UniProtKB/Swiss-Prot annotation:
This is Tetraacyldisaccharide 4'-kinase. GO terms for biological process: lipid A biosynthetic process; lipopolysaccharide core region biosynthetic process. It catalyses: a lipid A disaccharide + ATP = a lipid IVA + ADP + H(+). The keyword Transferase applies. Belongs to the LpxK family. Residues 208-222 have a biased composition (Low complexity). The gene is lpxK. Residues 206-226 are annotated as: Disordered. Signal peptide: none annotated.
Length: 355
């Protein structure tokens, strides 16, 4: 495990409990709370400008730092909107790429992690939707609509805290960790106070494969709630494109030794997904989020197959390693009416914008 990955694991463990480290860092969390409240007030009072796009905007983000499963929700949402007749476009910060002063806009497989960032490239490859990236999401939205005027709804990948762009729908994605110890950074894992969840339109909880939690029921009060499980699909060979059922990798006759690697916000969730599918990868290599694959981390691994996430796969294509297989995941929601409900909200927003 890389040092930065070890530090992240250390922080995650402490963020689940209100122990000595949280107590020690509490004064710094008070500064975070002051900064968050001050910044929000500046936007609410008009001291900072807010861009209003001419189409509805849906933000999918979180208040828990790190990976909670936002990207699969973005992909599922874009696909669901397209099925319902919308032409969605996506905006993102473009983390992992050097964007420069001007937004970068592209569509489909022309996007690469180096040019547009890891998650934007993955979303573009999975959906074919146009994607614009820039740290200032208002600029990204303007560039997106300029180059793709047919876009009639913008989905923001992350950006719940990016208040410089007006939004019509907010979806918060969390996982079984919930709000951790409930404290703001650095004493806890939260970017904003836990009460922020009361103001969003919907909360999707990404459940672990073996979670025994009772499915969240949709409620008529407060945010609409749904559970999500990420179900693995057939593995795809990175070099040939061939597909094989995931069960094949549990067959010692086909693959005597299977390893796994993940450079995502929560690698253990990916490994747990593989184990829940009946696989027993060894070793499980937890890499830092947004890992740079220009140098292979797999040379010391003795295995017949190495299973990686889709986010890692798009960065591993330049590696000459025939052992690499991508394991895509599909988001399955407990609320079958969620996307119809979201579409109804979007139509209301579009009508209000047109007036």
């Amino acid at each position: 495990m890389k040092p930065s990955s070890s530090r992240a694991s250390f922080a995650q463990r402490h963020w689940q409990h209100d122990g000595w480290l949280a107590t020690l860092l509490r004064p710094l969390s008070a500064l975070t709370a002051w900064h968050v409240a001050r910044r929000r007030a500046q936007y609410q009072t008009g001291r900072r400008p807010v861009y209003r796009a001419p189409v509805p905007v849906m933000v999918i983000g979180n208040i828990y730092v790190g990976g909670t499963g936002k990207t699969p929700v973005v992909i599922a949402t874009v696909q669901a909107l397209r099925e319902r007749g919308w032409t969605p476009g996506v905006i993102s910060r473009g983390y992992g790429a050097r964007i420069g002063p001007q937004p970068r806009v592209g569509q489909g497989r022309e996007l690469t992690p180096a040019s547009h960032g890891d998650e934007p490239a993955l979303i573009a490859h999975a959906t074919g939707a146009p994607v614009a990236v820039h740290p200032r999401r208002a600029l990204a939205a303007q560039a997106l609509l300029s180059q793709y005027p047919q876009v009639d709804v913008i989905v923001s990948d992350d950006g719940l805290q990016h208040l410089a762009i007006a939004r019509d729908i907010e979806i918060a994605v969390q996982d079984d960790r919930g709000i951790g110890n409930g404290r703001l950074l650095p004493a806890g894992p939260l970017r904003e106070p836990a009460a922020r969840l009361d103001t969003v339109d919907a909360i999707i909880t990404n459940r672990a494969p073996q979670s025994s939690a009772t499915p969240t029921a949709a409620s008529g009060q407060g945010p609409r709630r749904a559970d999500m499980r990420l179900e693995p699909e057939a593995a795809r060979h990175l070099q040939s494109g061939a597909r094989r059922p995931l069960a094949d990798f549990a067959d010692a006759r086909a693959f005597p030794a299977v390893a796994a690697a993940a450079g995502i916000g929560n690698p253990e969730r990916y490994f747990a997904t593989l184990r829940a599918a009946g696989l027993h990868p060894e070793p499980c290599l937890a890499l830092p989020d947004h890992y740079d694959y220009r140098r292979s981390p797999f040379e010391a691994i003795v295995a017949d197959a190495i299973l990686v996430t889709s986010k890692d796969a798009i960065k591993c294509r330049g590696l000459d390693d025939p052992r690499l297989w991508e394991v895509p995941v599909q988001a399955r929601l407990s609320d079958p009416g969620l996307f119809d409900w979201l579409e109804a909200r979007l139509r209301q927003a579009a009508a209000a914008i047109a007036r």
